[in-house]
Structures are given as C-alpha cells and as structure tokens.
C-alpha cells in the first residue's frame, strides 16, 4: 500500500493530466508500485519543479521531473466489443 502523502501527490499530478485530457491515476499508481526508483523521484521532486505537457501528434501525456521524462502514450482502437485504449509508459533519463 502506498503512503497517503504519495497518493495525494499522485492525485495532484493526475489533475494536471486530466486538465490536458486524460485520467492517468491508475497508471501512475501502477508505475510507482513497479518502479521504486521512479517512486523515489516523484516523492523527492518538488511539485513546482515538475512540468506537464501533451504531445497531440503522438497522443502522449508527459511528466518531466528534474532528471527524467515519463511519457504515457495512449494507443486507441476499436474491435468487435467497441472502442478500447492501452497506456504505454516510457521513461527517459538525462
């Protein structure tokens, strides 16, 4: 279980993504659960130093931390059951 402080930060981060057009809360929680290094970076980066953007062409939602960029690429499609989407997360360190 994630700490309440981290969950609040994830909700705040997600509000930015919602404002850009997509709810990524579940994907953010999954990411910090699977990647301790990313969890530590999110916990230790001040919110004011984070930046958020959307790449319309690639349908990606981007979170920039001080030393890495996390992009959530949205893949959409439709099949016999109707529309679907998948989120792919990519991390670049600099």
Which residue stretches match the model-derived regions?
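N-terminal trafficking/processing presequences and adjacent post-cleavage segments
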Residues: 1-38
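Acidic, low-complexity, intrinsically disordered interaction modules
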Residues: 26-93
